[in-house]
Each structure stands twice: as C-alpha cells, then as structure tokens.
Amino acid sequence: MFDGIGFMELLLIGILGLVVLGPERLPTAVRSISSWIRAMKKMANSVKDELEQELKIEQLHSDLKNAESQGLKNLSPELQDSIDQLKEAAQSVNRPYQVEDVPAAKETPAKETPTAEKSTTTGANSDKPNG
C-alpha cells in the first residue's frame, strides 16, 4: 500500500498528525483518509476493468476485420469463435432498434404524404387569379 515510503517516513507523518490534529481528532482523520484511499482504489479498479473490456472488444473487432480480409476461408478455430461472438453481440444490440424503427417508419410517411399533397394543391390554386 505504501510503496516507496519507509518506516521512518510513516513515523514522521504519524507524529506530525498527532501534533497538528491532536489525540482526539487523529483517529477520525485516519479513518476518513483510509476510506478515501479505499474509494480511490475501487475507482481505479473500475476504470481498469472497463479498459480491459474495451480492449477485448477492440480485439474482436480486429479479428473480424482479419476474417473479412481473408474472405472467411481457412479460419482458425479461435478466430471463428471470435467472429461468432461478435456477430451475436451485434445482433443483440441491433434487435431492439429494428423493432422500434419499423412501425415508426411505416406510420410517418403515410401521415406526411397527404399533408404534402394538400399544401401543393393549395399553392397551385392560389397562383390562379380568382375570376
């Protein structure tokens, strides 16, 4: 935990803390500092895990690019497994959007078409003189 800090440095920090904070506030300060350190470590581990996950995704993406360049022929079993995993992930991401987009796309043009025709007809009649 204290890489690079020796016993003498820790002793000096403890004595300074005791002098500055006093014996009543020192335990509370040590507890709060240790909780901050714990929170920082959790945050660092979280970032590390996210980066590892992103690197795995990037590796799968590069494997897919390699497979496409080889024409999906004579693939190693590891590469084929990576491609299958990537395809499954892509399908699971695309499915919810496909279901929602299809009904919305069908309704929108049907409503817009009559409105456009009415405005065109109205515009054509207004150009003609009344009489």
UniProtKB/Swiss-Prot annotation:
Family matches, as Gene3D superfamilies: 1.20.5.3310
GO biological process: protein transport by the Tat complex
Segments traversing the membrane: 2-22
GO molecular function list: protein transmembrane transporter activity
Name the record gives this protein: Sec-independent protein translocase protein TatB
Chain's role: Part of the twin-arginine translocation (Tat) system that transports large folded proteins containing a characteristic twin-arginine motif in their signal peptide across membranes. Together with TatC, TatB is part of a receptor directly interacting with Tat signal peptides. TatB may form an oligomeric binding site that transiently accommodates folded Tat precursor proteins before their translocation.
Main location: membrane
Pfam families: TatA_B_E
NCBIfam families assigned: tatB
InterPro entries per record: TatA/B/E, TatB
Family the entry assigns: Belongs to the TatB family.
Keywords from the named record: Cell inner membrane, Cell membrane, Membrane, Protein transport, Translocation, Transmembrane, Transmembrane helix, Transport
Subunit structure: The Tat system comprises two distinct complexes: a TatABC complex, containing multiple copies of TatA, TatB and TatC subunits, and a separate TatA complex, containing only TatA subunits. Substrates initially bind to the TatABC complex, which probably triggers association of the separate TatA complex to form the active translocon.
Region annotation Disordered: where it falls in the sequence: 68-131
Stored HAMAP family: TatB
Biased composition (Polar residues): 68-83, 116-131
Cellular component GO terms, alphabetical: TAT protein transport complex
Keyword Transmembrane: yes
Protein's cellular compartments: Cell inner membrane
Membrane topology: Single-pass membrane protein
Nucleus listed as a keyword: no
